[in-house]
From Swiss-Prot:
Keywords: Chaperone, Cytoplasm. It comes from Teredinibacter turnerae (strain ATCC 39867 / T7901). It holds the Pfam family Cpn10. The keyword Chaperone applies. GO terms for biological process: chaperone cofactor-dependent protein refolding. This is Co-chaperonin GroES. The gene is groES. Belongs to the GroES chaperonin family. Together with the chaperonin GroEL, plays an essential role in assisting protein folding. The GroEL-GroES system forms a nano-cage that allows encapsulation of the non-native substrate proteins and provides a physical environment optimized to promote and accelerate protein folding. GroES binds to the apical surface of the GroEL ring, thereby capping the opening of the GroEL channel. Heptamer of 7 subunits arranged in a ring. Interacts with the chaperonin GroEL. It is found in: Cytoplasm. The keyword Chaperone applies.
Amino acid sequence: MNIRPLHDRVVVRRKEEEEKSAGGIVLPGSAKEKPNQGEVVAVGSGRVLDNGETRPVDVKVGDTVVFGKYAGSDTIEINGEELVILSESDIKAIIE
């Protein structure tokens, strides 16, 4: 996949949506919540600071991350796969 996000942007592939609820009920498409976890597939070079230096992002390709519920409104489709473009500040945690 060839995508290179700019600055402190991160491209994430969302985790698969749950097909069933915790109680075993099959969820229709409209009842499913978009997952707020995913795998990092590309990272930008980092944030440019006021002094001109670039601070690299803290995540790397392959990391599994948790992001805010309302983050990820910027989505793109590449090769039939939906990807989310986030700012690094939208990422809440790295799952190790």
